[in-house]
A protein has these predicted regions:
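Short, surface-exposed linear patches
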Residues: 99-100, 173-174, 235, 259-260, ...
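Periplasmic/cell-envelope proteins involved in peptidoglycan metabolism and beta-lactam response
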Residues: 1-14, 117, 249, 288-314
Length: 314
């Protein structure tokens, strides 16, 4: 568990503890959990749908990051379609999408998402054996727009450690209590205490449905938005995320600058998961800067780290 922060004077300082305390808008990395709402409540379309935009009465057009063509659930994960997730959120309200509509989002619709996300470890404690673990921020505004944002990971915030719980649950079908301690040995080398590896909850959908999400995640790394992140020496699965966020640049209590943050989670080997990695890179692009370039820090870090882990442990 590692964290580094670049200060205003160009120095890196340790930021490791913030992995369990600070929370961030995670973006599309959580779509494996939000699409589970579709599986749980039988909302997944039976045929491929054409990617597009949603326009509600109270919103501007809300679209994917580019036009992604026809897709099923796995393809929607591979290329990180926002539109697919929007339609699931609208169907959850009992409505069929028409341009300019109101969907009548209620607190109950938000709680359906949050309960599913919680079963994956998002928005709740991981149980890690460290003090002052955070659970993130839950938005309080109940609007049609925010329900759609919830569906793509652009509303509530999550800690990096909770994102790790989520990726582990996708990989193994169960959410285990996280721990930095495996065992304690006596002076003679015998095991004095061993971690019990406690299961906190099960994945909230069937194994068949979970396998579809896993295949979508495999496609992310094989030919989708996560292509080139993990060494090709091992079969892997993963999910990228990008989110809009805001910061207070001069500590005056006023959030005054729009930024972009990125996330990525992966596990491998795909067929017998042993390793998972999550990276969160907050505020890597400021919207008021002249350059729109966004440094691919997640891919650079994951590529190097995964290669070293594979060589050492697999």
């Amino acid at each position: 568990m590692v964290g580094r922060k670049l200060t205003n004077n160009g120095e890196f300082v340790d930021y490791s503890y913030e992995n369990i305390f600070n929370s961030y808008v995670a973006g599309s990395i959580v779509k494996g959990a939000t699409i589970s709402v579709g599986y749980k409540y039988d909302l997944i379309p039976q045929k491929k749908i054409l990617d597009g935009c949603v326009k509600l009465r109270t919103t501007k057009d809300k679209c994917s990051w580019k036009s992604l063509g026809y897709m099923d659930a796995k393809e929607a994960l591979r290329m990180s379609s926002n539109y697919y997730q929007y339609l699931l959120a609208i169907k959850l309200t009992g409505k069929k999408y028409t341009r300019g509509m109101n969907i009548g989002a209620t607190k109950e619709h938000f709680e359906i998402y949050r309960n599913i996300l919680k079963d994956y470890g998002l928005g709740t404690l991981s149980g890690i054996d460290l003090m002052n673990e955070g659970t993130g921020y839950k938005g309080t505004s109940i609007t049609d727009d925010q329900l759609l944002n919830m569906a793509i990971g652009q509303y509530d915030t999550y800690t990096p450690i909770s994102l790790t719980s989520y990726i582990n649950t996708i990989a193994t079908s169960k959410r285990n209590k996280l721990s930095l301690l495996n065992m304690v040995l006596s002076k003679d080398g015998s095991v004095y205490l061993k971690n019990k590896n406690e299961v906190l909850s099960a994945a909230p959908i069937s194994e068949d449905n979970l396998n579809e999400i896993r295949e979508g995640f495999r496609l992310v790394n094989y030919s989708g938005t996560g292509y080139g992140y993990v060494s090709n020496k091992v079969k892997s699965a993963g999910k990228t995320g990008t989110s809009e966020s805001f910061i207070d640049t001069n500590n005056d209590g006023i959030v005054d600058l729009k930024t972009v943050s990125t996330t990525y989670g992966t596990y491998f080997p795909y067929d017998n998961p042993k390793i998972s990695i999550v990276i969160v890179s907050p505020n890597i692009k400021y919207s008021n800067k002249n350059s729109e370039y966004k440094y691919p820090i997640n891919r650079k870090v994951i590529s190097k780290v995964s290669k070293e882990i594979i060589e050492k442990y697999l």
